[in-house]
């Protein structure tokens, strides 16, 4: 088909009387004068080549490195290819060089008969390659196949003429092999690719168009109305095949796919051929110059004629719409010429020549404003402006203006009004207001003391108002009224309205006061009866508990495992771990005995050192008095108790409720509430001696505490707390909590503040440097408080009671003595159960961590962290 077109072009050139010129290619245009006739063929081919070069951005073909196949003609932008022999010899070059225009005309006349049988539709289109329909939508597959067969026949004829015909059998075999590889989707071997290259180069044809040539625009006869929805109401989003969105596609360079379709399936990358495949496609595919690669799917898309035309119009700076008429006749809707005759000739209305009523009302308002002085005339305005511009004079002293104001009373307060007369002052009062003889006699007796009288007059009754005589006390009452107005001071009292919210102190948020225990972490189970007491080792690794099941248990804190159980033979009411970290010793109050137990936990050398220290009793030169020997006895332990860890037994004459250690770990005190003046006894471990500090009973003693720094002893009775100096043996202070029964107390690590719990649900904070009365009382429990405790390191304190709750509070004590302690309740931990109206018995803090332990009537010990 292409050859036939070229021959037709050459024939037209011969008819136009062009001079014969030698040509070097069969596809080269013959003469410049023939540009108008073949503007839709040859220029379009050069346009195709230039557009292909701009898309590929290549100066020359990558496969044509030596320039053997293609030759550029600088005069015409048309690419021509030379046909090579299979041996690589250039035979046609000499023959084509000698070809004249007469020979071309002769060949065109011989082919006239063949051209008559061609399809008429070929002349209407610029090129069959540039059809709008894609291969999937084209219905004329049979016509395309027939065109391809005609092209192949023409190529074979030309090859025969040039002496390049190949054996048909070898060509059929090569096509069969190519079809086999294409059906298996496998790349072609190099020999088949080279064979296809030879077939392509044998024809020496390449369809091109010029870049400056536009496809023919269909002629329009008038402007027909177009339906904007004729092509279908679609959107850009529906045509998108890859759903990855607007992202850089180089993110998928390392993967086998380039995204996902609407069914969430991977879009596999298209296979990329090598340079040979690219060259074959460039030579064979007539749509190669208009084929672009979709960056989102990797598929090759063939641009239609409309797309090519749109690109060319945009590149040349023209309107993208091909149907838009740039030179459409202008319609001047509004003329610029001045009309000499009136457009409308309506007669004037009556109001156009009558005076306006609105202006009449406005003038009336102006006149009224001038009469009232609100509006100034021009002369008046000039006079006021002249006065304003005159120099102004001021008084030297400001008091000259304020003489009249000084004569007046500043902030005058009105005198109180007199009381209105009552029923007793009436001329005809009711009978009950009249005096009887007894009341009249009493009124007369107070003549010397008139201010004590119930009334300053005697009520009288008259029949009519005419019978009322003159008032004898009128002048005197007027005079007293004047004295009141003159002498009685009057002033205004400013009352400050204070809201209830201002009386409540502003406390910080608990979030700002962390860390403090918030959740239950571990539960220590093993006792069979209620647990009354608990104590923690100074290093914070073990705890000891005492219970009504007559046992003392040693627990490991981190695992909640019971390490050792020591039976005592009686109810254990108090346990205390020795605060001295150099020895491992626990004091337990069980019945009338105090047991000093080596728990045998922790450092082995420390356990052995404790046993060596308690093995032999030191010799004492002093002799205890009779009242001490009758109250307490230091005894040895049996073999069974020794195996359990008991080292020393101290027997008292009454039941021991509490045992507490001194800070150094050598002294400890015991409390026997029924012991009268011997209720409190202090024992020395190093000398194995005991002493009674008091000679008289001051009340029923509940508990005692040693001061953490000073040699002081705090003794709590039912209603008072006494502070004794152990060196001077004097009472230093007596605290008055104002309660009926004290249950427990704890002292701050610094020693300046004391915490007291009562059976009356009240928690009291004492500042020992401030007062002997409570600094603050907290009513945060709903039942009796059993135990209170301070944390050794953190500003925390806790209280436990029979309402199942352990309340952790923030108690900050400042070094500045002028600043009061800050007390903020933080957390209520309510996990224990109520058994026989009892719940939580004891509470104690961990020595180093913000943890708290509690023991209760439900036979458990709970750790809160």
UniProtKB/Swiss-Prot annotation:
Residues 30-44, 57-79, 87-159 have a biased composition (Acidic residues). Residues 1-195, 207-240 are annotated as: Disordered. Its main location: nucleus. The keyword Nucleus applies. It is found in: Nucleus, Nucleolus; Nucleus, Nucleoplasm. The keyword Lyase does not apply. InterPro entries: BOP1/Erb1, BOP1_N_dom, WD40/YVTN_repeat-like_dom_sf, WD40_repeat_CS, WD40_repeat_dom_sf, WD40_rpt. Disulfide bonds: none annotated. Pfam families: BOP1NT, WD40. It comes from the Eukaryota. One of its GO terms (biological process) is maturation of 5.8S rRNA from tricistronic rRNA transcript (SSU-rRNA, 5.8S rRNA, LSU-rRNA). Keywords: Nucleus, Repeat, Ribosome biogenesis, rRNA processing, WD repeat. WD repeats lie at residues 526-565, 567-607, 651-693, 696-734, 737-776, 780-819, 835-865. GO terms for cellular component: nucleoplasm; PeBoW complex; preribosome, large subunit precursor. GO terms for molecular function: ribonucleoprotein complex binding. Residues 160-180 have a biased composition (Basic and acidic residues). Belongs to the WD repeat BOP1/ERB1 family. Required for maturation of ribosomal RNAs and formation of the large ribosomal subunit. PANTHER family: RIBOSOME BIOGENESIS PROTEIN BOP1 (PTHR17605:SF0), RIBOSOME BIOGENESIS PROTEIN BOP1 BLOCK OF PROLIFERATION 1 PROTEIN (PTHR17605). This is Ribosome biogenesis protein BOP1 homolog. It comes from Anopheles gambiae (African malaria mosquito).
